[in-house]
């Protein structure tokens, strides 16, 4: 990452069994041939492919803050995550939408920045309609700063 540019890596999902093995062994190696992987192509690590496929994007598709990097000043510029989000869903996309709305550039790091996501039960998605509406509003109105964000916590520390 650099100021004015956030980077997005790829994510490989581990099955419950692969996660249990990884946690039990502690010293293990994962790659495209490992058992129990979803999104297997994301496990490919290649300098050549990285050079060919890493590119700038203005899309929200595939935004996952589990493997995401940016500068603190860029976070503060948009007031961080919107604390009004409840439950699972869309907070990552809404955060990235405000970054893009503010002129911060996205760069996808294909085949180089790989995160292995441990299995866990899925969270309740009952708040998804409200979260979808909040994301749609941010996109439609080109919102840059959320009202209830990180500023609230920074003020409390003073």
Task: Locate each region found by the language model.
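Short aromatic-enriched loop/helix-cap "lid" or pocket-rim segments at secondary-structure transitions
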Residues: 18-23, 121, 127-130
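Intrinsic low-complexity, glycine/proline- and repeat-rich
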Residues: 43-44, 48, 140-158
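Conserved hydrophobic/aromatic beta-strand scaffold that supports enzyme active sites
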Residues: 6, 67-69, 115
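A short, conserved alpha-helix in the catalytic core of glycosyltransferases
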Residues: 62-63, 67-79, 86-105, 110
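Catalytic core of nucleotide-sugar-dependent glycosyltransferases
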Residues: 112-113, 126-150
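Active-site donor/metal-binding and catalytic loop motifs
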Residues: 14, 109-126
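Conserved donor NDP-sugar-binding/catalytic core segment of glycosyltransferases
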Residues: 2-36
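A recurrent flexible, glycine/aromatic-enriched loop bordering the glycosyltransferase active site
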Residues: 35-70
């Amino acid at each position: 990452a650099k100021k004015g540019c956030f980077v997005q890596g790829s994510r490989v999902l581990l099955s419950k069994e692969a996660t249990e093995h990884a946690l039990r062994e502690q010293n293990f190696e994962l790659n495209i041939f490992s058992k129990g992987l979803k999104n297997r192509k994301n496990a490919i690590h290649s300098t050549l492919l990285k050079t060919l496929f890493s590119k700038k994007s203005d899309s929200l598709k595939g935004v996952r803050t589990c493997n995401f990097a940016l500068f603190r000043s860029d976070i503060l510029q948009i007031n961080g995550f919107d604390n009004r989000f409840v439950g699972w869903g869309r907070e990552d996309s809404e955060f990235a939408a405000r970054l893009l709305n503010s002129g911060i550039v996205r760069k996808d790091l294909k085949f180089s920045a790989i995160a292995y996501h441990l299995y866990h039960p899925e969270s309740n998605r009952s708040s998804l309609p409200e979260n979808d509406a909040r994301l749609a509003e941010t996109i439609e109105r080109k919102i840059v700063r959320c009202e209830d964000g990180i500023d609230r916590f920074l003020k409390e520390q003073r």
